[in-house]
Amino acid sequence: MFEFDFSDELKTKIALLLKRDKKRVEIINKKVREIISSDEAAISRYKNLRRELKHLKRVHVDRNFVLTFQVDLEKKFVLFVDFDHHDRIYSR
């Protein structure tokens, strides 16, 4: 089990999304629970990103949205960084 936190940017996005699309927020919460309940070997199944995002991993939420997160295996800590449309995440 991992400890976790959300970035300030992600907290804002989830708060806004809660007003517009509660179902997507429920899906995000389900993915967060899935990730933090993983063990160290299972967390490696999530895709590592490349280039300037290489310190992040990602998981798809719904069909076109991505939740990015950073894992510190030594501290057993996950920082959820961003949630956005697939095209906007990768255009950075």
Predicted regions and their residues:
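Residues that form or immediately flank small-molecule/cofactor binding pockets and catalytic motifs
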Residues: 9, 54, 85
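Short alpha-helical linear motifs
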Residues: 30, 50-54, 69-73
